[in-house]
């Protein structure tokens, strides 16, 4: 089979204006970027304000493994197949960060014959939204550092006299707004700024990857430009010496930050291999952020299509949970059905029997993940069953989609389908979207349509009015199956402080490992009798949630021993090669 890159480069594409017209966009509602992509103007929402909305489908997965489960492949393949059976469908997915593209994970355009094309344009830069987020974020960091410098240099009276601005009395050790870059760069996790003469008071700081920026979350959760402007104004950049918050509005930088992102709020329209529309917008990670594409993209697509297929990052304990408890809480748009993606490989890897973790230990034999192994499959089914029940907990009909690999055993696939059909799932189908494109997920598409016709009884996991401690306990015990939650001394103090400042009503965004339902990546399958350790609570007042840092999760990844950039180059024709 051809590589993803080869398939993408050989694709016959619709002109982007034709694609937009087929979706229902007017020419003036598209800002063209060449022939293959266009920004969608938000004026379309005003034109279609009274339009009946389509049905939203959320795609999630079992606990992820290094083998890849094919969640984006399924999202794109399902969209293609829905259009093939006569439904009008549109996909809504996140913009890939270049950190994973050049790291281990690679691109995020799907794969095989179920991908967004041209995939190299999607995976590298696209229309510049992530750069806009980085620039706006770093403007805020530069502004707070400059204000600190001038206030320290002049003192209150002289500063106010010369600048005409209020003295903010910034506490250097309470600056909460650091810097971001769209790369994996571990050496930037801890830095000191202000070093040297006349460069400002020294203070400790850091870099996060741009996908972890609160501005990225704001981009994903805003309803329109005015809402984004208001949210940016609420950003808490620092505390003063009395412990009071200093916002971007207080600093006078919110307007300029918004101006940088004025075009970034518009989703980007691209197409799949069979010419199905796909809106790409925002890129928050699901382990260290809320992990879903934008409310605006969903809203536009739902007014133009019968079915909108979106996805949450990683497993149902991660992006799906945050889709429900953060995104739906703010959008008011509940899903009609969910698709839970799994593979035979994923279940064997999640079995807890000679897993990849064990392979790091000497003298332990790890079976071939592609070989039939009924014992590992049955043990790993517990993980799938947990995720089925987790999705069903939210009152959503769940369809299991099994991504077929060429090495899969027919007998094992049959056993898995029978096991799923005896579970709480609405249905189960095998998908060959990777190898067959739109023809490979027809059965999945038909079952999803039937599931979406049932009456969804969507419900949130916890109410707004619950205390922060109660929300943490619910997420740990109900959301992950933990026996409890433990807060560090710092986290307890932060919970009290955030409640006192009036932020206790906000939902929680759990930042934890995606490689286990628990906080510990070595605990496979369905962990039991564990306590979730919360080390820190971080306020994101603009985005409208509080992040709980769990275990050893980091907001700046690092490059591995064999990073993806080693394979990427330009050939003699000037074409990008090695991207996948």
Curated annotation (Swiss-Prot):
Keyword ATP-binding: yes
GO terms (BP aspect): tetrahydrofolate interconversion
E.C. designation(s): 6.3.4.3
Molecular function, one GO term: formate-tetrahydrofolate ligase activity
Reaction catalyzed: (6S)-5,6,7,8-tetrahydrofolate + formate + ATP = (6R)-10-formyltetrahydrofolate + ADP + phosphate
Keyword annotations of the record: ATP-binding, Ligase, Nucleotide-binding, One-carbon metabolism
One Pfam assignment: FTHFS
Top-rank taxon: Bacteria
InterPro entries assigned to the protein according to its UniProt record, in alphabetical order: Formate_THF_ligase, Formate_THF_ligase_CS, P-loop_NTPase
Binding site for ATP: 65-72
Pathway this chain belongs to: One-carbon metabolism; tetrahydrofolate interconversion
Any coiled-coil regions, as ranges: none
Broadest EC class assigned to this enzyme: ligase
PROSITE patterns per UniProt: FTHFS_1
Protein family according to the UniProt entry: Belongs to the formate--tetrahydrofolate ligase family.
Name this protein carries in UniProt: Formate--tetrahydrofolate ligase
Organism per entry: Shewanella baltica (strain OS223)
């Amino acid at each position: 089979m051809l590589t993803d890159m080869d398939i993408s480069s050989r694709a016959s594409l619709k002109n982007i204006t034709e694609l937009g017209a087929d979706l229902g966009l007017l020419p003036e509602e598209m800002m063209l970027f060449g022939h293959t992509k266009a920004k969608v103007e938000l004026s379309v929402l005003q034109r279609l304000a009274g339009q009946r909305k389509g049905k939203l489908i959320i795609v999630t997965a079992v606990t992820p493994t290094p083998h890849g489960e094919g969640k984006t492949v399924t999202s794109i393949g399902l969209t293609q197949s829905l259009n093939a059976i006569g439904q009008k469908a549109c996909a809504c997915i996140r913009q890939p960060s270049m950190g994973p593209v050049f790291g281990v994970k690679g691109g995020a355009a799907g794969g095989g014959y179920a991908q967004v094309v041209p995939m190299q344009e999607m995976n590298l830069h696209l229309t510049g939204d992530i750069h806009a987020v980085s620039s706006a974020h770093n403007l805020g960091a530069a502004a707070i550092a400059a204000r600190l410098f001038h206030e320290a240099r002049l003192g209150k009276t002289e500063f106010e006299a010369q600048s005409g601005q209020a003295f903010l009395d910034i506490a250097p050790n309470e600056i909460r707004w650091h810097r971001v870059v769209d790369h994996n760069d571990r050496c930037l996790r801890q830095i000191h700024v202000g070093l040297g003469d006349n460069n400002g008071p020294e203070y400790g700081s850091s870099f996060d990857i741009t996908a972890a920026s609160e501005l990225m979350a704001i981009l994903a959760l805003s309803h329109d430009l005015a809402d984004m402007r208001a949210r940016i104004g609420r950003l808490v950049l620092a505390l003063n010496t009395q412990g009071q918050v200093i916002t971007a509005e207080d600093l006078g930088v919110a307007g300029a930050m918004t101006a940088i992102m004025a075009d970034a709020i518009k989703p980007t329209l691209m197409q799949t291999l069979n010419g199905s529309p796909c809106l790409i917008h925002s890129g928050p990670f699901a382990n260290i952020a809320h992990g879903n594409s934008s409310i605006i993209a969903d809203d536009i697509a739902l007014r133009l299509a019968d079915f909108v297929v979106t996805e949450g990052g990683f497993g149902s304990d991660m992006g799906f949970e945050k889709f429900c408890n953060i995104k739906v809480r703010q959008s008011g748009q509940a899903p009609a059905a969910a698709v839970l993606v799994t593979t035979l490989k994923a279940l064997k890897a999640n079995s807890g029997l000679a897993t990849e973790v064990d392979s790091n230990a000497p003298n332990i034999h790890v079976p071939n993940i592609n070989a039939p192994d009924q014992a590992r499959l049955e043990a790993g089914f517990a993980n799938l069953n947990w995720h089925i029940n987790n999705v069903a907990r939210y009152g959503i009909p769940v369809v299991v989609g099994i991504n077929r690999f060429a090495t899969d055993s027919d007998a094992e696939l049959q056993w898995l389908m029978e096991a799923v059909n005896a579970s709480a799932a609405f249905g189960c189908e095998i998908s060959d979207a990777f190898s067959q494109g739109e023809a490979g997920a027809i059965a999945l598409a038909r079952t999803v349509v039937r599931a979406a016709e049932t009456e969804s009884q969507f419900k949130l996991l916890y109410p707004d009015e619950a205390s922060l401690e109660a929300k943490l306990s619910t997420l740990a015990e109900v959301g992950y199956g933990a026996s409890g939650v433990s807060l560090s001394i710092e986290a307890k103090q932060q919970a009290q402080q955030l409640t006192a400042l009036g932020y206790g009503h906000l939902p929680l965004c759990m930042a934890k490992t995606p490689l286990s339902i628990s906080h510990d990546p070595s605990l496979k399958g369905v962990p039991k009798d564990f306590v979730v350790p919360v080390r820190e609570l971080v306020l994101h007042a603009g985005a409208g949630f509080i992040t709980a840092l769990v275990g050893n999760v980091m907001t700046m990844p690092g490059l591995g021993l064999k990073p993806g950039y080693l394979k990427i180059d330009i050939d003699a024709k000037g074409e990008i090669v090695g991207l996948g």
